[in-house]
Curated annotation (Swiss-Prot):
PTM section of the record: Contains 3 disulfide bonds.
Signal peptide stretch: 1-18
Main location: secreted
Protein name, UniProt field: Putative potassium channel toxin Ts20
Tissue expression as described in the entry: Expressed by the venom gland.
Location relative to the cell: Secreted
Species, as recorded: Tityus serrulatus (Brazilian scorpion)
Length: 83
């Protein structure tokens, strides 16, 4: 009986976590009045550059580059700074 409950909970949570990225809302990264593109002159890949832009305020966010524009997800975790 306990094993059945644990199994049901495991399947429910793993399914929820697996589908989480699909339901996540993505927001375009904006600077001024424009939408920021992923291309850069720093020699970084588009995904790395987009990640750097989305996380510049010290908060963990998912990021993605879609159609050469940068999109940021909602805040995940605060960064922990080790001294």
């Amino acid at each position: 009986m306990k094993l059945d409950i644990v199994l049901i909970m495991f399947v429910t949570f793993s399914t929820t976590l697996a589908q989480h990225d699909e339901r996540e809302e993505w927001y375009p990264f904006r600077f001024g009045n424009g939408h920021v593109g992923c291309s850069n002159r720093l020699g970084m890949s588009e995904n790395d550059f987009c990640r750097k832009l989305c996380n510049q305020d010290g908060k963990w966010r998912n990021s993605k580059c879609k159609e050469h524009y940068c999109y940021c997800g909602p805040q995940r975790f605060y960064r922990v700074i080790k001294l």
